[in-house]
């Protein structure tokens, strides 16, 4: 047996060897740090026995997959601790996630004191150092095992597996769980962990199922790494849009209205309107024409597009096909509507490309368990567009769509925070898609070549394409590390035929156009959440709901403050006057907490000279200035959408 290691070196063995034995053969230090193995790209237990030629990488907690194994084992230790302290608790699932791990239990909610007690029990379990053993059972025996244990959620999971399947289990001491693995060799490998919070979660993410209690935690290989992560989590909490957005009166949610249906408050509307005007003006400069299409349509439209067969579960359907004459659905996207705008007229090859833009309100029937602030909602607004092009125009127009997206990211100051993904079809799951394999391979090849020509680093994600075409997804992580798609640009060589779209070529013949589906900035709600977290609420001045606050030092300067305010408003500056009878220090602190970028302090000297004293969050005290000079500077900053660097800390201002 020849084992090829990550560095290309090879080891030859006359007999089968376990991954951990090979790790020791390489280095005792590596073996001690090992969490799992990676055989031909697949993570496996260290106890896995190899008996044929393969490629092997020993995974440690420094590797993403290795850290996931450590965290997965930590979730099992958590579950064992909970059932030790709360014997009536039923276990559901407990995976590793990007930021740690969680486990779901059917039991009453946990308090912070409960979590502290569970942590202590986990430490006891780890100190005992039980080895982790893997074994298998038949499907029938596994069902019987969990029925005897009175674990209904595990029974359901096993029952969903195919007949004849071999079911894997992991045990640590006298506690056993259903699990595909891999896991550490011993619970002793969980050296640094922390239980973070407890919340509610529906079983399998569906509100139709039981509400469970979820415990979140995280784990690292060392206490220093854990400490660093916890400090980052504190900063994340400070920036979390779901908390900060409410504090800043940007949005709120109300139970009686429903999950995933945020109310955008006046401050949030100001930001969204600024973004919308900017995007629409930019699209107009780039040759887009605007449409306004209905929020719903008959099911017939979605049957033509294929959404009825491939996306119906994600739509809000109004009516019953069996009893109602007409069934409608709220639109989950704008594309089929804009196709009929195109079809309303005949087009020649000279008319193309046609670029349609629309600020669209869309509806998607997401599970309740997926709802979160502004990032996962059921109704949202999006800068949607569709380009109808000749095949020979496709590459240039697609690149131009990427350029528009990059321009938007650059203006918002987030171009360094995103990753690019080529989302491809899954040839092993063809029923999910329309079109022939050769069309998919060709279109994916075009996108791959474009990204390479543009020197854009990207990853390829199988199975992430829409049902009618591959796409470029531009993703960003929130403050907790969860990745969301911000912008999508999609190649579609198929739906023009579904809708019988054509143009007349130079020979007078009908030809099928290609279609580009794209967003320039993406979903406004998600972008707003992203910006709140990126800037901790301290938006660039052009986006700030309140750009200037005038602060008179006493009541006798209210009239002058009002004159300053009036002049600011005449010049389009969003401002207010703080006329409260409070100490100056308090009013200045309040303006900082409201994240107002500029304060204009006015008193006797300023009134006498017709000036203002400027304090900014960028430089602190900027001195006394002519109001006209301040106006010229802030108007230029707003016009250019400048992102000023904060040079001084709040406490030094």
Task: Cite the ranges covered by each PLM segment.
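NTP/phosphate- and nucleic-acid-binding module
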Residues: 1-90, 97-653
